[in-house]
Amino acid sequence: MIRTFEMELGGRPFVVELGKVAELAQGSCMIKYGDTFVLVTACASKEPKEGLDFFPLSCDYEEKLYAVGKIPGGFIKRESRPSEKATLTARLIDRPIRPLFPKGYHNDVQVIATVLSVDQDCPPDISAMIGSSIALSVSNIPFMGPTASVSVGMIDGEYIVNPTSEQKELSELELIVSGTKDAVMMIEAGANELTEAQILDAIMFAHEEIKKIVTFIEHIVSEVGKPKSEVIVKETDSELLAEVVSFLDTKLANAIKTVDKTERNENIKAISAEALDYFEEKYEGRSKEVNTILSKQIKVETRKMITSEGIRPDNRKLDEIRPISSEVGILPRTHGTGLFTRGETQVLTVTTLGDLRDAQRIDGLGEEDEKRYMHHYNFPPYSVGETRFMRGPSRREIGHGALVERALKPMIPCKEDFPYAIRLVSEVLACNGSSSQASVCGSTLSLMDAGVPIKGMVAGIAMGLIKEEGQIAILSDIQGMEDALGDMDLKVAGTENGITALQMDIKIAGIDRNIMETALAQAKIGRTHILNKMKEAITSPRTELSAYAPQVTKLKVHPDKVREVIGAGGKVINKIIDETGVKINIENDGTIYIAAPDQESARVALEMIELIVKDPVVGEVYTGKVIKIMDFGAFVEILPGKEGLVHISNLAHERVAKVADVLAEGDLIEVKLMEINPQGKIGLSRKALLPKPEKEAPNKVE
């Protein structure tokens, strides 16, 4: 039976259709938002996976190019690996729903969102996020939702729900918020130096819209929802728990307080091994239970130590930042480098400058575009002292790279002021938490070292939260252990003036406005401290680019002159490129960018183009090249691509019988421009520049 439900979202109808397609999935729905259609399905395995200590959830976002009437490019005419946008959207679907499954539920769960049709003003990512919540909520899968998601923009101080593509161009904020009726679960934001108060107001505005959507989904579930499967989770043996806690005594707490990460892990590992050996001997075959209890006790002890004693695993205060060091210019042949170290986290970021043709072409479900500023983040296994196969970038690496890219984007100069493509690569050399925010700092240092005139320095900090038995501890600059065992991961990047990027994931309910307000205020203090430390290495962008960076020169010509610079079949522009070794990029408005390996090549190419676009002037004298001999005269090229005729009568004062008697093809001669007729044809004279012969005196008759 087909059921249709409708509400208004962002001033447009949002329609949910159930019971028509994908009926064999445990949960499915078709989302129709304007002309955007997204099919979302949810399925779970019948039995849990044995031996897992995590929840095996996978979320996929499939971009079908037929949704925008395109055929995939290349030799293989079908969609292949997900685009960066698809990967980021899959992460947006995953993050708010993952905490809402029962603890101990280890069945495989897969959510697939397939984009079937795209209306650029009705975002398919938001449709997919809401659709995933609906598909899970109406299924028998034990999902403790529903959740909902909205996008928020800000124009002239006013917040807009799900802004259109035109509104996004004007917006100072790009915010996506997911949550339940009671709490915000996930935030992803990019902003143009907005204040903490503006960001917080936008989040609260989004949550009010989320509440309306959740109420709408609850109505759908009440009408068509299936009974939820029962989750049987084995309870911890209270007697065994008490024995393990007694055995650990204060040893575990002391091990957790070890400052050095590697030493701390070794100490915890040694105590755990000792406990496992002891209880295996005492209760044979119960090692798995003991191991589960040990993992829980590590979390309990760490959280209790932070909330009750105000002590963190490395003995820092709650708002204390780890020691920071910054360096620039450490790689001699690169265009710019920044090495940022914070505690045991270290990131090297390298800047590479290229000409505008190096910009990345974006050809997905959105309108065709190109990206001249890119950031890529790499997290090799050695950064955490581990081994693993190194293949392509993981979803996490793509997500972190996009976050750092968003943090720096408002500071990147426009193409007109800095006509370069910019690629940043952050290599995580060592990691004990906050590597993405260390990449923000390293990227700022690297850009400044490269001489990119950024509008301001950007720093990033990761904040954490522990909420235990009514006690709340907000942590600045969290390390890996605090991230894993905490209740919130809040990453904030910005300048001294405001926030440029924000990402938040919350694992528990009950994070209210006051907590977020306190966390953002504490993050600002930490961010300012980090910026001051970064200034010890470099305070402003270098005034000169690296000697190894391309030299880009900009020239503006009348649009009508563009065809003259290009020439028939590209003849003129290819000649310039061949003779000078430069790269040339021409835009429709007449802006020409010349990228050269050195300043001399740039100068020569610039002069050649200036000559091409220069208009011939009547009365001017030119040195031209004879390009063709005719019976009636010679054609002479006076400027690149511009030629005129020297009529045989204008070659010399005396009578010339044959043009070839005076000139040959390839000769360089001086000519004067005598006229340009209404058809644009140029008349030249060689004779006008030659001295007139003296008249012979008449013979005297005796």
From Swiss-Prot:
Residues noted as binding Mg(2+) in the record, renumbered to the chain: 483, 489
InterPro entries the UniProt entry points to: ExoRNase_PH_dom1 (IPR001247), ExoRNase_PH_dom2 (IPR015847), ExoRNase_PH_dom2_sf (IPR036345), KH_dom (IPR004087), KH_dom_type_1 (IPR004088), KH_dom_type_1_sf (IPR036612), NA-bd_OB-fold (IPR012340), PNPase (IPR012162)
UniProt record, GO biological process: mRNA catabolic process; RNA processing
Protein's name in the database: Polyribonucleotide nucleotidyltransferase 1
Domain of life the protein comes from: Bacteria
Family: Belongs to the polyribonucleotide nucleotidyltransferase family.
HAMAP family: PNPase
Protein localization: Cytoplasm
Cofactor requirement: Mg(2+)
KH domain mapped to chain residues: 550-609
Ion transport listed as a keyword: no
Species, as recorded: Alkaliphilus metalliredigens (strain QYMF)
GO molecular function annotations of the record: 3'-5'-RNA exonuclease activity; magnesium ion binding; polyribonucleotide nucleotidyltransferase activity; RNA binding
Alphabetic keyword roster: Cytoplasm, Magnesium, Metal-binding, Nucleotidyltransferase, RNA-binding, Transferase
GO-annotated cellular components: cytosol
Domain S1 motif: 619-687
Top-level class of the enzyme under EC nomenclature: transferase
